[in-house]
Amino acid sequence: MARYLGPKAKLSRREGTDLFLKSARRSIADKAKFDSKPGQHGRTSGARTSDYGLQLREKQKVKRMYGVLEKQFRRYFEAAERLKGNTGANLLGLLECRLDNVVYRMGFGSTRAEARQLVSHKAITVNGQSVNIASYLVKAGDVVAVRDKSKKQARIVEALQLAQQVGMPVWVEVNADKVEGTFKKVPDRDEFGADINESLIVELYSR
């Protein structure tokens, strides 16, 4: 399955929640009515969605939010099952450790897609070494930075300014002057308020 390249607001409307696929400066919440599905006037059918349908929709939502395709998402789930603790929380923790997501959380990219592009264009280092793999898993204590030649890019400067206004997550510590940050720890499930019901995903893969 290829990565979706169509309108971002359409995906958020389909899932009924903001997937944070666009910059906070142009919030999808202001551009899309989440109580209607894609279509000229939205679909008004009140048909009840099956349990399987709800589980599948939740998985699709999380995949789109983090920009992960099915095969890779399944591998994350299998890895989460092998870890101690709650499988659903482990799954989200692994997704939060992805380098593209950490770059986004630190405010170097205004969206995860933009952060992924920075990684693939070799604009990001981890502990002083260039890393261009978006799925690279960042560990607690790792220092993630923008390379010197990229620090003055307008999109990075603007994204960081916006992130400072909105506020950084507690599990990252960012030095805006150096355009670098430390990934302090894998966030606890209750530390990020994403509109995700990960138990539905666990139920889906346990069928």
UniProtKB/Swiss-Prot annotation:
InterPro entries: Ribosomal_uS4, Ribosomal_uS4_bac-type, Ribosomal_uS4_CS, Ribosomal_uS4_N, S4_RNA-bd, S4_RNA-bd_sf
Sorted UniProt keywords: Ribonucleoprotein, Ribosomal protein, RNA-binding, rRNA-binding
Highest taxon in the source lineage: Bacteria
BP terms from Gene Ontology: ribosomal small subunit biogenesis; translation
Disulfide bond residue pairs: none
Stretches for region Disordered: 31-52
GO CC terms in record: small ribosomal subunit
Coiled coil location: none
A GO molecular-function descriptor: structural constituent of ribosome
S4 RNA-binding domain: residues covered: 97-157
Function noted in UniProt: One of the primary rRNA binding proteins, it binds directly to 16S rRNA where it nucleates assembly of the body of the 30S subunit. With S5 and S12 plays an important role in translational accuracy.
Family: Belongs to the universal ribosomal protein uS4 family.
Assembly, per entry: Part of the 30S ribosomal subunit. Contacts protein S5. The interaction surface between S4 and S5 is involved in control of translational fidelity.
Name this protein carries in UniProt: Small ribosomal subunit protein uS4
Organism, as annotated: Acidovorax sp. (strain JS42)
Taxonomy of the source species: Bacteria, Pseudomonadati, Pseudomonadota, Betaproteobacteria, Burkholderiales
